[in-house]
Amino acid sequence: MAEPTSTLSTATPAAPRISFVSLGCPKALVDSERIVTRLRAEGYELTRNHDGADLVIVNTCGFLDSAKAESLSAIGEALAENGKVVVTGCMGAEPEQIRAVHPSVLAITGPQQYESVLDAVHQAVPPKHDPFLDLVPEQGVKLTPRHYAYLKISEGCNNRCTFCIIPKLRGDLVSRPLNEVMREAEKLVAAGVKELLVISQDTSAYGVDLKYAESRWKDRDWATRFFDLADALGDLGAWVRLHYVYPYPHVDRVMELMASGKVLPYLDIPFQHASPTVLRRMKRPAAQEKTLARVLAWRDAVPDITLRSTFIVGFPGETEEEFQELLDFLDEAQLDRVGCFKFEPVAGAPANALENPVPDEVKAERYDRFMLKQQAISARRLKRKVGTRQQVIIDSVTPGGAIGRTKGDAPEIDGSVKIASRRPLRVGEIATVKIEAADAYDLIGSAVGF
């Protein structure tokens, strides 16, 4: 877990100390930030050491068996080092699985149950709060570095993909009103955040549940809609990066915001597959047969757009012909950044009941072929950047330079730029870098313009 960015530790020496472990996706990280912010507001101090804490909170992931194993391991480690552990998050929706392995945990709550987490903490370690001494930053306590932040715009999902249990864990789509999201975003930017990463389970469905109701922001009524939110965020002066976007037709409108520079020319779109028959078995939303045409149209509208996606190979019933359709799609779409997963059954997912499961050795072979093809595509696309000048946000400083990311790279999941510089660069600074070399995933360059 990253060090919380609140450096104001003015609580009394006797303030209870909480150690926090956050596992899983960025949506879970935002949940962790909300809990941590409430704890700091109540006078609790945060520590990274379990053995020096009065209590440990573990925010779990329960999407895949491997994630559950990691969560159970983290709980066991916390129990061994501390003994007082509160468990929350997606795996908390199945408390019997946790109790079977770790019966001594103090409490288990499901995802988004912030009040239940706080109640459990209060019972185990009552707060010692002095509102005149304790101070929490207005933007809340963040678990990311200071210069970027995840902005969660909704909870839950209305889709019913057969490989996924997110609706079971987190419920149907619940969008936050646009003015509420904008107030949070404005506070983050005022606190020094240079990059806002917009996240949800289905970002392009934002506002559907509210029937796109209008809300007041900056003397104007804005619809609670994907395009309107992106447009409003683009006025804040920070990089705006859009994640978990489904290829619905209305996403086309966002191209004008990218072309004008209001939001980054970047889309994270979880295609998952390209074969129409596999997609039907997956029950994926959107008109997938038009996806390739849409990708090509986006590239025409915004030539420098970066498209990232994730795919699943070895889905039940996947034939060699269907897998070849996926490889052909990679050739035609020429995506910039791609992740791939071998299908893994998730307890409670309808896909588990589908016929003709793919043998593990076939999954592994297809995964290797997929990654080899995409690696070559990514390398060719990055090579095009050699000789160009790119705006790069600095993530860390190194002797004689820094490590950063272009507008086409999200933190943690995409590539980076290794930068040589004659002057010191600062974390969070946006520098102009001349790209001098590239490999399959990363760039090398020199800072210019000084």
From Swiss-Prot:
Which molecular function GO terms apply here?
4 iron, 4 sulfur cluster binding; aspartic acid methylthiotransferase activity; metal ion binding; protein methylthiotransferase activity
Free-text cofactor note: Binds 2 [4Fe-4S] clusters. One cluster is coordinated with 3 cysteines and an exchangeable S-adenosyl-L-methionine.
Q: Which reaction does it catalyse?
A: L-aspartate(89)-[ribosomal protein uS12]-hydrogen + (sulfur carrier)-SH + AH2 + 2 S-adenosyl-L-methionine = 3-methylsulfanyl-L-aspartate(89)-[ribosomal protein uS12]-hydrogen + (sulfur carrier)-H + 5'-deoxyadenosine + L-methionine + A + S-adenosyl-L-homocysteine + 2 H(+)
Localization per record: Cytoplasm
Q: Mind telling me which Pfam families this protein's record contains?
A: Radical_SAM, TRAM_2, UPF0004
Query: Locate the Radical SAM core domain: which residues?
Result: 143-380
Q: Which UniProt keywords apply?
A: 4Fe-4S, Cytoplasm, Iron, Iron-sulfur, Metal-binding, S-adenosyl-L-methionine, Transferase
Write down the EC number: 2.8.4.4
- Which residues are recorded as binding [4Fe-4S] cluster 2? C157, C161, C164
- Cofactor(s) annotated in UniProt: [4Fe-4S] cluster
Classification via InterPro entries: Elp3/MiaA/NifB-like_rSAM (IPR006638), Methylthiotransferase (IPR005839), Methylthiotransferase_CS (IPR020612), Methylthiotransferase_N (IPR013848), Methylthiotransferase_N_sf (IPR038135), NA-bd_OB-fold (IPR012340), Ribosomal_uS12_MeSTrfase_RimO (IPR005840), rSAM (IPR007197)
Residue stretches making up the TRAM domain: 383-449
List each copy of the MTTase N-terminal domain by range: 16-126
PROSITE patterns documented for this protein: MTTASE_N (PS51449), MTTASE_RADICAL (PS01278), RADICAL_SAM (PS51918), TRAM (PS50926)
Instruction: Read off the CDD domains from this record.
Output: Radical_SAM
Which Gene3D superfamilies does the UniProt record give? Methylthiotransferase, N-terminal domain, Nucleic acid-binding proteins, tm_1862 like domain
Could you state one GO cellular component term attached to this entry?
cytosol
The answer, when asked if Transferase is one of the entry's keywords, is: yes
* SUPFAM superfamilies on file: Radical SAM enzymes
Which top-level enzyme class is recorded in the Swiss-Prot or TrEMBL entry?
A: transferase
Q: Which family does it belong to?
A: Belongs to the methylthiotransferase family. RimO subfamily.
Function recorded in the entry = Catalyzes the methylthiolation of an aspartic acid residue of ribosomal protein uS12.
Q: Quote the HAMAP family the UniProt record gives.
A: MTTase_RimO (MF_01865)
Name the PANTHER family for this protein: RIBOSOMAL PROTEIN S12 METHYLTHIOTRANSFERASE RIMO, RIBOSOMAL PROTEIN US12 METHYLTHIOTRANSFERASE RIMO
For this protein, the record's NCBIfam families field holds: 30S ribosomal protein S12 methylthiotransferase RimO, MiaB/RimO family radical SAM methylthiotransferase
Name of this chain's protein: Ribosomal protein uS12 methylthiotransferase RimO
Q: Lineage of the native species?
A: Bacteria, Pseudomonadati, Pseudomonadota, Alphaproteobacteria, Hyphomicrobiales
- Per UniProt, what is the name of the gene that codes for the protein in this document? rimO
